[in-house]
Each structure stands twice: as structure tokens, then as C-alpha cells.
């Protein structure tokens, strides 16, 4: 099942970006021109569809083709200035935007922890290199392994098992930035508690632009 905003046939002269967010039960896809959403959809995946794959990595071709079909159905050519995918379970890093390369794709594909978000950077990188007019850069932003925890937030009760930072960083930080804009403040100047309530649930304490404590949303 696909839920659409109004499609279009032209991208115009501003920078165009394809956004891909693979989740446990859906793949969200959007095209932005500048800061304006041109077409946004959620492609739902039934249990029956996903059960044909032995592991999440096997869904890569299936989900990539769904994105290509979505572009075709909405008369949008594969010709973007950038493609950005949801960041997966890579090594712990600071928040921000990162350019995808083959090494990142390999690390994500071979990640010890498995989740559909691992497909985000891989599909973005593959589509970026499939563009008929030449490859464009692929990126991820604020992956689920963003780690800016305070030292005391890592204490678990055993020094052998420190608490890990695996959370919905992209959505939480986006909502925090939106809230800050709505009240006329800077995210970096605020102390906030932000909760993500979806297929998974994470709650994080944001202190001056950094999530200094959060529950582990995967393990």
C-alpha cells in the first residue's frame, strides 16, 4: 500500500534530493526540491512479503526495485543532485551528515546487529551510481549509532557490559530542531526530553545539542 502526496513531472532548477528510509515494516521514500517536499510516500510491507527472505540483507534488491518502481510511477527520473538513506548500525559516531562510500556499505552489510535500517546507505549508494547521467553523492545523516553519551550514562552495573547508544537519532534530532524553531530558539541552547514512539521506542535526554543519555532501542 502506497500513500502519496501530489506527484510531479519536473524537478525544476533547484537541488533535488531522493530520500530513502527503510524500516521494519515499510520503506519511506521522498523527493525534495530545495527544502520543499515534491512527493512523499510510505510503501508498506506485509509479513507475507518479507517472510520470503531469509535475512534482512536479502531484502536489498526487493526494496531497491520498489524505489525505482515508485520513481517510475510518479514520472520522476533517476537524476538527482544527491541521495540520502537512513543510517544503519555502523560503528558509534558523532551526529551529523556523512558521505557514503563502499567501505561504509560493506561495514553496514556485515554489521553484527541486524535491522532494516542497514539497507539505507547501501540502497542510496547503489542508486546514486545507477544514475544514467552520472553518479551523484550518497549520504546518511544521524544514524542510529550516534553516540554522545555522558560517561555516567554508560554505567550498567557491570564494567564488562557498558550501556550502548542505539536510538532513533535522526527522528529525535529532527523533532528537537523543529521544536526549537517553533519557539524561536536554537536546539543547541535547549535541554529537552524527546521520545520516539514507533515500531521501536527510545527516549533521550538532549543537552545543548547532544543526546547525553538514551535507552537502547534494539537490544
Which residues fall in each region the model found?
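N-terminal phosphate-binding loop and adjacent alpha-helix
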Residues: 39-78, 102, 108-113
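Glycine-rich phosphate-binding loop of actin/hexokinase-like ATP-binding domains
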Residues: 153-219
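Short beta-strand-loop/turn "lid" adjacent to the catalytic site in phosphate-handling enzymes
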Residues: 71-116, 137, 145-157
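Short glycine-rich, Thr/Ser-proximal phosphate-binding strand/loop in the N-terminal lobe
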Residues: 13-58
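A glycine- and small-aliphatic-rich helix-loop capping segment at beta-alpha/alpha-beta transitions
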Residues: 32-37, 96-107, 131-134, 154-159, ...
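Short glycine-aspartate micro-motif
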Residues: 15-20, 80-84, 192-196
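Conserved active-site and cofactor/substrate-binding residues in soluble primary-metabolism enzymes
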Residues: 24, 58-62, 66, 118-122, ...
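Conserved phosphate-binding catalytic cores of ATP/NTP-utilizing and phosphoryl-transfer enzymes
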Residues: 4-14, 115-129, 150-153, 167-192
